[in-house]
Amino acid sequence: MKRGSLLWAYMAALAAGAVLAGQATGADPIKIGVVNMLTGPLAEGGRFTVNGLQLAQEEINRSGGVLGRPIELLTEDNASTNPGTVLAFSKLFTVAGIAAIVGPIASTQVQAASPAIAKAGIPTMIGGTDPSLTRVNNRWVFRARPNDLYSSKVIADFGVNTLKLKKWAIVHATDAFGQGGAKALTEALQALGVNPILDQGYSSGTQDFAPIVLAVRKSGAEVLGTYMTYPADQAIFAKQLRQLGVNIQWVGSPTTVTVTARNLAGEALHGTYAVVDFNADANDMTRAFTKQYTERFGVAPDNFASWSYDALHILALAMNNARSTEPEAVRNAILAIKGYKGLEGTYEFDRNGDGLHGYSVVRNEGGKVVFIKRVDFPVE
């Protein structure tokens, strides 16, 4: 979808949500800000985020809203950039009555905005998985996805103990997500007695991966572990990897099986493994959501849609439980959530603000994502 079409589609969705909110109740709406990628290289993922939020907003408002009031979403485009994210947050912080914010999925964007979020003191749900994001003394950031301390352990364990492979090459973006993931994966492998034989970083938006592919081939690696931020980068890398004759096993982060990456890469990603926070076939809830989403939007959902859907529902639950939209009350109510079943898993927030603590392993079989196993970790 072109950027202009995406933006117009999003505005139409907002209008539909506003009408629905008006139908739910005549009370003044509760304002929730959204910082999302409507333009730029992550705009396709932003479209899935829009759709997930729209479905959640409709469900919440149909069921009576929050504290008897409808939810209104106020969205700012971050243009898929760090400066755009900081600007988007600053605009939302000036809006009177913002009760909470659904922030970005990209770790580097969350990292850029974290000081401003801490200063504003507004509860903010994030989808970025860099472990450090909830460990920087920012009491207003809460994660609605599992972080990469968990994904790295699952990737390492599956590759070493299930696939029985010990010669690892790690390829990652050099942003917060990629570097955080690569560091965590290296540590997880070392805990299993394995030292990676290659670590290669790249800048997001790279078009020529040939030097990295050749380095992987020359290294003699048996298995590839990846933390790649942009689905388009994932697809380009996969195609160039296959074109240059590298067909080793591959266990990647969730980007590996996003709808966008699979559509762009086609056969180049067939046979690869990945860890995922959202599995469409995990249970009755995810299957029902996938059916509803696909019928509504004409494409299957991925984690961009599932995490934003869960994030809005969690905020609504916290405000209802707190019987308040006051920031401190909402913060405490989020941290008190235990056993809430969402699309991404069962939420139990720890003291850092992390709500999920496990991943599933899946395989791309001919373009279809097939479940292999689920791994959960104790809440610290």
Model-predicted segments: where are they?
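Extracytosolic ligand-binding ectodomains
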Residues: 2-11, 15-17, 22-380
